[in-house]
Amino acid sequence: MQSSKGRRKVGSTTAGAGIDSAEKLDELLISSAICNGEDLGPFVRKTFGTGKPETLLHHLKFFARSKESEIEEVCKAHYQDFIHAVDDLKSLLSDVESLKSALSDSNSKLQSVAAPLLSSLDSLVEAQTVSKNVDLAIGAVTHCVRVMELVSRANQHLQSGNFYMALKCVDSIESDFMEKTPSSTLKRMLENRIPAIRSYVERKVNKEFGDWLVEIRVVSRNLGQLAIGEASAARQREEELRIKQRQAEEQSRLSLRDCVYALNEEEDDEFGSGHEGSDGGSSGGGLLGFDLTPLYRAYHIHQTLSLGDTFKQYYYNNRDLQLTSDFQIAGFFIVEDRVLRTGGGLISKLEVETLWDTAVTKMCAVLEDQFSRMQTANHLLLIKDYVSLLGVSLRRYGYAVDSLLEVLSKHRDKYHELLLSDCRKQITEALSADKFEQMLMKKEYEYSMNVLSFQLQTSEIVPAFPFIAPFSTTVPDCCRIVRSFIEDSVSFMSHGGQLDFYDVVKKYLDRLLGEVLDEALLKLISTSVHGVSQAMQVAANMAVFERACDFFFRHAAHLSGVPLRMAERGRRHFPLTKSQNTAEDTLSGMLKKKIDGFMTLLENVNWTSDDIPQGGNEYMNEVLIYLETLVSTAQQILPAKVLKRVLRDVLAHISEKIVGTLCGDLVKRLSMAAIKGLDVDIQLLDSFTENLTPLLTDKEAREMKKAFVEIRQMINLLLSSHPENFVNPVIRERSYNALDYRKVATVSEKFRDPSDSIFGTFGTRGSRQNPKNKSLDALIKRLKDVS
């Protein structure tokens, strides 16, 4: 404790000079802060923080004493200026007194001079008042005269029926003159007569508007008929243009160079654009000439009467009633379109759309009801055509007809079902009237109507007449029915809002051909075909139908506006395949029955004879005579491919019949001569096949011989030196692949040499056996082991 006190004393002694300099610094800082207007708070806090406020007070007092001298100098300077200013004011006092006396003298002189002028001014004011009253009287008289002139002019306009000008005169009187009219009598007269005049004008205009409403009903009916007729004429022109285009395409397809070119002149009419002009009164003598002047006049007058909104509602209500009662759609909405565009707001677009929606809803309901009751395709098509024409007519004016077209599309299936039913009846009648005779055409127009119109010709060369066609009358009759079906289907599908409808037409065309025509032909074949000639004619007809079906699909694509290459790309198989196969099978079956009649002569063949028939057996000669006669007749009717299929089937049947006879109970034993006789018979069949060279190519002739390959291989096996080779798989596959081992075993057993039998061995014991017989015995043994 003593040492620390000693250190403090030393510090205070040595820092005496430092404390004085610190006080001077604080004094300068406080002076500077006061001069600069700074905050003295930090100094105050510091002073009280150290516990020595006397120092701060000392500094503030010192600063105040230092500023007293400055204050005294400033006060002395301003005191001298104030003294000088007081002296200057005292010097001006005498001048002000002299000015006051001068002003008093001037006022006295002015009063003496202005007294006469004031009396003259009073007289002037009195004269001006009198003049003003006279002017007011003249103005009142002039006002009354102008009012009477307007009244007279209004009466003249009322008498001449110029109601608008009469109302303008009345409005002018009411707005410009009536409040200013000085005559109370005249004013009361105007107040009583103006409402009466307006009421009179309103009654007259309403009567004219009522007459127009009655007249526009008749105009709408005629206008609708005219619009539908024009749309129909435009559609007819389009159809004619399409026909010309088809003819040009046909000429191009046939490479005809002599073509005729013509300009297509299109008539510009008011229906084409749907905008007939901007004249609010009438159409100016065009196709849509109807007068709207009474309507617009009534609307204008009601606007003048400030009843425009009332008249709008009145007009809308009356037109709504007319639409509901008359239901004249086309003409009604053509008129409304004109009123919308030229009526100056008489009816709004929303109101027209509301009327249209009402009409469309009612039309759709009526169409749904009528379509559900219809049982005739023609009636449905007529209504569809009319509705589509209505849609075309009103679409030009911007009305949405999609709902109507959707109703038509919804009944597309029903229409086609009815159309299929009608075609089924027509096809049945056409087939029942068929006499199964080739069609005779005496004139070129008959050829064009029955052959060229359906592209049934096989050559571009026109034949000589009379011409006998390979088909019967049922072919062109059915073609006409199918073509009519296609055209009716396209007519229903076109002009209905759907652009790509070929697939729909094709679907129903497939049904017509695959269900209706095919089933009718199958029924005809099963019930009415009783002879070879009839079956041959039906088979020939089927071949022609195959070409006709190609035409049907091309025709449908053409009418639908689809390129032929796309239609060919989507083609399927021949839709009449069932009836075609049935017709050929029926023909083959009847021919087989005929052949079976000749094959009964196989019973007369001596199968154990040792003599070889040089010219073949009797049955084969009869069969060949019949086949040659058949071919010569069939070549004139049947196409080559059909005749080939039928002949192949018949030849295969002959082969099966011979093999069946050899394997049957009729033949107990076979001799070598009998087998060689069969070989002669088969050679005759080969010759017959080879003689068909104009009909068959060499390749086709070889294919035709495969029809009797079974009997040929059987004969070759029996005539071979080593029949045992049949059991060799390689040789069998190469030379005997058509033979059945059971049939071979049966025939080989019958062909065995009787000397090799059990009872024949006694006479030949010890002699050498024939190698062929030995091979045959081995074959029989091997086949028995297999079985």
Curated annotation (Swiss-Prot):
Domain of life from the UniProt record: Eukaryota
Protein keywords: Cell wall, Cytoplasm, Cytoskeleton, Exocytosis, Secreted, Transport
CC per GO annotation: cytoskeleton; cytosol; exocyst; extracellular exosome; phragmoplast; plasma membrane; plasmodesma
Keyword Translocase belongs to the record: no
Gene that encodes it: SEC15B
Organism: Arabidopsis thaliana
Presence of keyword Cytoplasm: yes
InterPro entries xref list: EXOC6/Sec15, EXOC6/Sec15_C, EXOC6/Sec15_C_dom1, EXOC6_Sec15_N, EXOC6PINT-1/Sec15/Tip20_C_dom2
PANTHER family registered for this protein in UniProt: EXOCYST COMPLEX COMPONENT SEC15B (PTHR12702:SF1), SEC15 (PTHR12702)
Cross-referenced Gene3D superfamilies: Dsl1p vesicle tethering complex, Tip20p subunit, domain D (1.20.58.670), Exocyst complex subunit Sec15 C-terminal domain, N-terminal subdomain (1.10.357.30)
A GO BP annotation: acceptance of pollen
Family: Belongs to the SEC15 family.
Subunit structure: The exocyst complex is composed of SEC3, SEC5, SEC6, SEC8, SEC10, EXO70A1 and EXO84B. Interacts with EXO84B. Binds to EXO70H1 AND EXO70B2. Binds directly to B1L.
Name this protein carries in UniProt: Exocyst complex component SEC15B
Main location group: cytoplasm
Summary of the function given for this chain in its UniProt record: Component of the exocyst complex involved in the docking of exocytic vesicles with fusion sites on the plasma membrane during regulated or polarized secretion. Involved in polarized cell growth and organ morphogenesis. During cytokinesis, involved in cell plate initiation, cell plate maturation and formation of new primary cell wall.
Subcellular location: Cytoplasm, Cytosol; Cytoplasm, Cytoskeleton, Phragmoplast; Secreted, Cell wall; Secreted, Extracellular exosome
Pfam families assigned: EXOC6_Sec15_N, Sec15_C
